[in-house]
Structures are given as structure tokens and as C-alpha cells.
Amino acid sequence: MKRTTYAGLVDEKYLNQTVTLSGWVQKRRDFGDLIFVDLRDREGIVQLTFNATHAEALAVAENMRNEYVISVTGQVVRREASQINNKIHSGQIEIDVIEAEILATSKTPPFYIEDNVNANEELKLQYRYLDLRRPEMQKNLRIRSKIMSSAMHFMDQNDFINIETPILAKSTPEGARDYLVPSRIFPGSFYALPQSPQLFKQLLMGSGFDRYFQIARAFRDEDLRGDRQPEFTQMDVETSFMSADEIRELVNAWVKAMMSDVVNFDLDTTKIPTLTWQESMDRFGTDKPDLRIAYELKDVSETVKSSEFGVFAKAVEAGGVVKAIAVPGGAENYSRKDIDKMAQYIERFGAKGLAWLKVTDEGISGPIAKFFPNHAALLQVTGAKPGDLLLFGAGRNDIVAATLDYLRRQTAKDLNLIDMTNPWAFAWIVDWPLFEYSEDFDRWIAAHHPFTMPNEEDLHYLDDGEDPHQAHAQSYDLVLNGYELGSGSIRIHRMDIQEKMLKALGFTPEAAHEAFGFLLEGMTFGFPPMGGIALGLDRLAMLLAGQENIREVIAFPKNSRATEPMTQAPTRVDHKQVNDLGLFVSDVE
């Protein structure tokens, strides 16, 4: 039987027509001489009816079970009024089946194929091909596909050239650990899977292509969390002779087109705010703020530095800060026990406690209220009103920022204070520090990557005798709803500046040329001013699909241990293959 349409597309327009459908049995209800079967395919569900009028088809239906693959031919008829289901597209009609065939049988699945299924995450990953049958997963991956199609169309319309860059590349010290691939032909030598196409796309600009685009796979051997995977996909762009402002305007137009194509949302890009990195950190405690949350961090250091509360006074005296958030309605909704739980959680950020006050019609209450008999100034600075809960952070600026950023996001989630009238809150974060200190590496590293151009007025900081860590960069991040969606910058195109940048990062001239000699030499042949950005496809798909984990928008993802339960990768390989690579693998318990 040749399929004529999808099950989920059949509706009243097909009344009295004969159709042939194929798909999976979602549910079967047997009433003897009348059997109902819900047929599911990628477009949705339609109800099939089998009755004694077509005895052969009824006999086939008697053997059908959940997840059997079937094909049917029948007439589209209107459902009885009591059978109408307005929750599905085909809910007004059903198929009176004339002919039926079972194409494949199925074992009983380890979990039911439906949305909101109560199944262990590892089990769903182990049987990912079953999990992907769920309507929600089908929707998620189609959203991902739409994003890719929209991006490629936009780039084609704007004269970008789609160029693929190597997957087997040279290992370069760009930040995260590389995934290494041993060479059989050159024993002891390794390729690296690229963490990004960064160097290749700069070389393409040096080659004169002017506008490059690629949907690129990238790989990083790093610890995982909900919005990260060891392999990921980015929509990668590089341009020549464009300023940072021009690149951001281009990306705004690109994102506007994608939002329209994928979720039918008319994004007003004129309302996308641009914040400096410092402003974002001061107001929100993070470089990826969720602007749907109205309340912000308020610096109360000057107000409390002379208070009798020693924790605050000592923090300011030691060069730290005291900041607060006023959580609307928090006074009534958080008990002391709730606040104690928050205090325990924020210890992971380095916080040594959580000071708080509840604002009432009479004034303030709480364990530190007695230290602020004249609290009017405190309420004025924080903007707190009766019913609000004031949460404080005191100490080192970075610890206070991380603590209050978490508390701001968590309280907004707890109390439904996220403004859903603004469902897509984009923002640009600009003027980043050129360097940042890494606790992991115990040294200064590039805040974005080593090829980011400093601000023009900060170039002198790279000279000998200057402090390079004072420099800021011509870099920009696009943020959406508290997630970093994309990161970009103007690149260094002159060898003298690039060498100074690498020196500031601790590279000797020999080490710089060992790692990046091909790029440095290329710059001696005249590279144009260039800049670009990479948008994370996985993260964008996650947000547009309304998911909280990027695994839900990747067909075959890894789990939090970077393993893939379905194929059980990574696995040991044949001993001969290892020998051919000139490697020795020690036994590891």
C-alpha cells in the first residue's frame, strides 16, 4: 500500500476521501466487533475504526499491539459527536478502515511512548530511538531543523559562502581540553577535533572570501552540565571589513528572521538593549542576565558601611561590597526554613551566610533588623516595598555577584516573577575584559580567545611595562533569557598585535610560533580587518522548544558522564587497532 498522506494531517478537508496511512499503533481499544486504533506518525495521531463490515481488516486489527508498524487504507468519515477530540488536529474525523497490514511487530516497550512519560532519563537514552518517537521529541528536532534551514537561507540571501573546515585539525591551546585522534601514519602524533573553526575562518578571510558561514560541529572535553555537551553545533560566521556595530546589526536581522521562521514571533530588534560587561555585572551579577526578571542587584555598601552589623561593615572595610535584591512578595512566601535552605545552597559560591530582612508596613523584621533602626535609606536604595524580601550578599565582588545572580533567578522561578509578556529577552553584552583569571589554570587566560582585538584605546596595555589585564576587548555576546546564545568579536589581523597578545598570555616567541605559526605567517601576507560570531544551535533550539536541557534537542546526545547509553560509547577497541596506532593502553579499574 502506498501512503497518500500523513496520519496527523488528515482532517475535515479529507471527508469522504479514501486515504492510505502508515505509522505506529499508539493505542488499541477492543470492543469485539469494533476495534479502535490510534495511529501515530511524525505529524500526529488519527483514530482508525475496524468493524465487521470489513472482516479481513478487523481480523488484522485483532493482532495489533502498541508500537506495531501498520499500513491501512480507509475512508475518512466524521466522528460521532461523543467521539470528537478537540485536543488533536484530526479530532473531528476518523478512518473507516477497509484494508490493513502489519508491517512489523514490536516487543513491549520499556516505557510508554507519550509526552511527560514517567521514565528514568538513562533508560530513555538507552532506548533513544523509542524516546524520539514521542511527539515532543519530534517537535524539538523539527524546530532544530527549521533553525538550520532559516539560517542557511538568510546567509545565502546575504551573500555568505558556505565553506566546510577540517574536523581533523592541529591541537592548539585555546582553553578547554581537546579530544585527540592518534595518527596511524605518524605514530606518536595526534590530530585534535576542533573546539571551533576559529583559526580556519580567520584564514578564509585572509584568503579573500569576505563572508563565510558554516553550520559547524565542535568538540570540547570538559565537565558537562544541562546546557553543554562534549560535541555541539554552532552557526559560525566571519566577515571582512565590518565593524562590531555592523556585525551586531547583521546578527539582529538574522535572529529576527529565525524567530519569525521558527516560532512565528515578530522580534523588534530596535528594543534589544546593549549593556557593557561591567554594567551587566553590576546590575545582575552575571554576564548573561535574564532581563525578564524586573528586580536587580543594588549596591548598598555606602549605606551599610557604618552600621552596627559587623559582617557588612567588615566586608566594606576589606575592600568588598554589600549588595541586595528586593524580591517582590518574598516576605510572605519564604519562611525562615526556606531561607536557611537558600543559605546552605549558596555556600557553593563561597558565601558564608545569607543576611535577610522582611519589609512590612511597620518597617523591617528579621535577624539583623535591630542593626538598622534608621532603615529608610536602605529601603530607598533597594527600592523595597512592604511585602518584599531583602536578600544580601557581602564580601568579595565575584562571590557576591554569583550568589545574588543565583538568588535572583531562583526566587523569580519560585514566585513566578519571570515576565512572560516578554518571552524572548535578547541583550548584547559588549566591552568585555580582554583577560580573565582562571581558578582552574591558576593564571590569566583570554576572556574569549587569544585572537580577540583589544579596544583601540587599550592597545597600549599590551606594550612592555604596561598591565595587559586592564585592557578591554572588541567582543560581544548575544544573550537570550539568561543564556549565552552567541559569542563574537573583532579579530586581531596584524601579526605585531597578535604576538603581543600571545606574550601577555605567557607564550614565549617559540611557543607562539609552535602553536600558531601558520596563522602568524599568514598575517605577514596582508589580512583584512575581520570579525564574526558563533551562535549555539543546540542552545537556541533548546530555548525555542521550551526545554531546560540541550539533550532534548539533540538526536543522540551524551549523558552527564559524557557516555552514550544506547551504543555504550566510549568503549574499548580491538587490541590490534591500538597496536597499529603505536599506543599502549594501561588497564584502568
UniProtKB/Swiss-Prot annotation:
Source organism superkingdom: Bacteria
Region described as Aspartate: spans on this chain: 198-201
One GO term of the biological process aspect: aspartyl-tRNA aminoacylation
Catalyzed chemical reaction(s): tRNA(Asp) + L-aspartate + ATP = L-aspartyl-tRNA(Asp) + AMP + diphosphate
Matching Gene3D superfamilies: Bira Bifunctional Protein, Domain 2 (3.30.930.10), GAD-like domain (3.30.1360.30), Nucleic acid-binding proteins (2.40.50.140)
One MF term in the entry's GO annotations: nucleic acid binding
Coiled-coil regions listed in the entry: none
Keyword Ligase: yes
Annotated binding of ATP, by residue: 220-222, 229, 484, 536-539
Gene Ontology annotations for the cellular component aspect, listed alphabetically: cytoplasm
Keywords associated with the record: Aminoacyl-tRNA synthetase, ATP-binding, Cytoplasm, Ligase, Nucleotide-binding, Protein biosynthesis
Annotated binding of L-aspartate, by residue: 174, 220, 448, 491
Keyword Magnesium: no
EC code(s) of this entry: 6.1.1.12
Family matches, as InterPro entries: Aa-tRNA-synt_II (IPR004364), aa-tRNA-synth_II (IPR006195), aa-tRNA-synth_II/BPL/LPL (IPR045864), Asp-tRNA-ligase_1 (IPR004524), Asp-tRNA-ligase_1_N (IPR047089), Asp/Asn-tRNA-synth_IIb (IPR002312), AspRS_core (IPR047090), GAD-like_sf (IPR004115)
Compartment(s) where it occurs, according to its Swiss-Prot or TrEMBL record: Cytoplasm
Similarity-based family: Belongs to the class-II aminoacyl-tRNA synthetase family. Type 1 subfamily.
PANTHER family given in the database record: ASPARTATE--TRNA LIGASE, MITOCHONDRIAL, ASPARTYL/LYSYL-TRNA SYNTHETASE
Function: Catalyzes the attachment of L-aspartate to tRNA(Asp) in a two-step reaction: L-aspartate is first activated by ATP to form Asp-AMP and then transferred to the acceptor end of tRNA(Asp).
UniProt subunit comment: Homodimer.
NCBIfam families recorded: aspS_bact, PRK00476.1
Protein name (Swiss-Prot/TrEMBL): Aspartate--tRNA ligase
Organism per entry: Leuconostoc citreum (strain KM20)
Gene: aspS
